[in-house]
Amino acid sequence: MSATINPVVDNSVFTDCKVADLSLADWGRKEIAIAETEMPGLMALREQYADKKPLAGARIAGSLHMTIQTAVLIETLVALGAEVRWASCNIFSTQDHAAAAIAARNIPVFAYKGESLEEYWDYAHQIFEWASDGSHTANMILDDGGDATLLLILGSKAERDPSVIANPTNEEEQVLFASIRSRLASHPGWYSRNLAAIRGVTEETTTGVHRLYEMEKKGELPFPAINVNDSVTKSKFDNLYGCRESLVDGIKRATDVMIAGKIAVVCGYGDVGKGCAQSLRGLGATVWITEIDPICALQAAMEGYRVVTMDDACDKADIFVTATGNLRVITHDHMLKMKDQSIICNIGHFDSEIDIASVQKYQWENIKPQVDHVIFPTGRRIIVLAQGRLVNLGCATGHPSFVMSSSFTNQVLAQIELWQNGKDYQKKVYVLPKRLDEMVARLHLGKLGVKLTELTDEQAHYLNLDKNGPYKPEMYRY
């Protein structure tokens, strides 16, 4: 049977959505069709599982960037039997034509580019609103950054102890805590009811995974979680090769700057930082790295990068990129010392890496959406991209379809695993087994014309391996 979902002819009565413009649906559908040709992993899963419907009965609350590639993920989940409600995990990352195309298929989606923080948290609640009478709730979470998971857990804590939302430390927490207080007043017990129904969560990104491990360490993880980020076919491909292409796409769309000849500082030399450094060097920039980890710092030095501190670099470089997952990596003092027209941006999940709040007191001049001048009293200006949020999604369209197919194939397999076998898992964080990692890679080889060498029986015996894998031990680093 065909894995293609039949289009909805008349969606004029469908109102369970919030998108910028439904008239963009045809445009979105055309781009989705192109993306499908570049996402062999997801399309293979549709063909393999469409008849079996392994996600039948699953009601997935999805919080992940609402892009064209995510539309292919959503429709794959639906093809495999799931019901889905979706919101973006970033206020700037939605592609409005992608959201419209999903809404046109009568799939509830709540996302548009340029949401306010109030809308963002309202939409995060909406993905759990399965039935107005409370007869149905979400039973799975697909998360990116951990906000959907955090919302239910923090809200449940606040039902027992309102003091946990009494002292916000930043603007985002102010809005989140106010949203929770409002829901506590209007829907008593809503958070704990929804939390109790969740079988598990699959988490996409480094920052969200860090949150999950922290909860596990404290004994506060309420359900099993699968760490999709640390699948090799996610972290070593999406984080590295995806960022290698999408970082400079965002910078150049936003600024039209010539990168060749500039000094660019990449803060953080993990998988994301490695991809960013490669792309900037490839376009002719002199790349400097900042790092806290001696191993990563040594890797950077051995690749020929100069490893410095932000204090060393802030008054010398032209472009600054944060890729750490930390907070206040670029401080107020750093920005005050930067050269006129220096460009600063972030490619980590949250907007905490650049201390944007500290420069709100200065004059801001909007150049175009997600591109601003901050004008200091001296008259010097710096260019801030996407208000310190994800530059590749705020100023461009994120990673290419092919590399997202690898990540999202892991997500689908993780959802199937938790939905079908969740009772076998404890309230811990797990990683998909090596055999599935290798399966994801295999599904993408044909598109690139790759031919694998097959072990002979003699070779397999010599290496003590199954001819069909897995080929590496779990601790192998790649």
Swiss-Prot record:
Q: Which GO terms describe its biological process?
A: L-homocysteine biosynthetic process; one-carbon metabolic process; S-adenosylmethionine cycle
Entry-linked InterPro entries:
Adenosylhomocyst_ase-like_sf, Adenosylhomocysteinase-like, Ado_hCys_hydrolase_NAD-bd, NAD(P)-bd_dom_sf, S-Ado-L-homoCys_hydrolase_CS
Specify the superkingdom: Bacteria
What catalytic reaction does the record list? Answer: S-adenosyl-L-homocysteine + H2O = L-homocysteine + adenosine
Alphabetically sorted, this entry's keywords are:
Cytoplasm, Hydrolase, NAD, One-carbon metabolism
Compartment annotation = Cytoplasm
Q: What is its main location?
A: cytoplasm
The EC number of this protein is 3.13.2.1
Cofactor note from UniProt?
Binds 1 NAD(+) per subunit.
Q: What is this protein called?
A: Adenosylhomocysteinase
Q: Which organism is it from?
A: Nitrosomonas europaea (strain ATCC 19718 / CIP 103999 / KCTC 2705 / NBRC 14298)
